[in-house]
């Protein structure tokens, strides 16, 4: 039985479970009856590691990373990969309008944006084009579909999640971030207030255990 009191952060929690479950499925993606896809713990761990390496190359420790996606396996992979890379996840509702995203981006100044599809990027595109502090944009769906019919100022900013997870891992690669403890920020949640703009609330790794 795992004692979460012995864990320092959410990455350790995942790795602990991944080592036990390994070949078992963690996700079932059901797009339609003839299109089902499963992901094992082992496969998910590798995908987190591959993505985290690319993120780490493009952010500094403590940088915010905006995550705009529906609930899907890649959301989970992205969230953990950001933490492993030393970033702080800023998840955003997919129901936000363009002005909401603009406010969020100006408030938290993310170095990286992860976006799922064309519909979402349409609402983010103007802000991404305007803000130099956004170094990279990673698309969860195939990159050409996500960027279709959009005016991108800098196409070099854009990376494809699906190509990233095709990368090979080195023998010594493993998931860890020894700098994270229970007081370290895990994410910034923007909550809708009764009036005015949403307020960002920092949630720590320890706070997620409670």
Segment roles from a protein language model:
Residues 1-12, 31:
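Flexible, non-catalytic linker and terminal segments flanking ANL/adenylate-forming cores
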Residues 37-38, 52-96:
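Conserved AMP-binding/adenylate-forming
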Residues 38-42, 186-210:
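Conserved AMP-binding A3 loop
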Residues 24-26, 158-159, 166-190, 197:
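Conserved pre-ATP/AMP-binding loop-to-beta segment of ANL
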Residues 96-127:
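Conserved ATP-dependent adenylate/AMP-binding module captured primarily in the ANL superfamily
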Residues 14-18, 28, 44, 48, ...:
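Adenylate-forming
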Residues 13-40, 145:
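AMP-dependent adenylate-forming
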Residues 69, 92-93, 134-143:
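Short beta-strand elements of ligand-binding domains
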């Amino acid at each position: 039985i795992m004692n979460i009191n012995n864990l320092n952060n959410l990455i350790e929690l995942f790795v602990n479970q991944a080592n036990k479950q390994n070949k078992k499925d963690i996700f079932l993606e059901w797009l339609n009856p003839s299109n089902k896809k499963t992901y094992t713990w082992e496969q998910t761990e590798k995908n987190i590691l591959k993505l985290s390496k690319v993120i780490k190359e493009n952010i500094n420790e403590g940088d915010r990373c905006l995550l705009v996606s529906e609930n899907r396996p890649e959301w989970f992979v992205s969230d953990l990969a950001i933490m492993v890379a030393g970033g702080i996840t800023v998840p955003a509702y997919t129901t936000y309008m363009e002005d909401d995203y603009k406010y969020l981006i100006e408030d938290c100044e993310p170095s990286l944006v992860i976006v799922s599809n064309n519909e979402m990027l349409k609402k983010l595109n103007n802000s991404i084009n305007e803000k130099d502090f956004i170094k990279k944009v990673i698309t969860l769906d195939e990159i050409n579909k996500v960027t279709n019919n959009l005016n991108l100022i800098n196409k070099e900013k854009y990376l494809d999640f699906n190509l990233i997870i095709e990368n090979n891992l080195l023998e010594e690669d493993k998931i860890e971030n020894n700098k994270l403890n229970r007081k370290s920020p895990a994410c910034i949640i923007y909550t809708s207030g009764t009036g005015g703009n949403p307020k960002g609330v920092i949630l720590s790794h320890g706070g997620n255990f409670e």
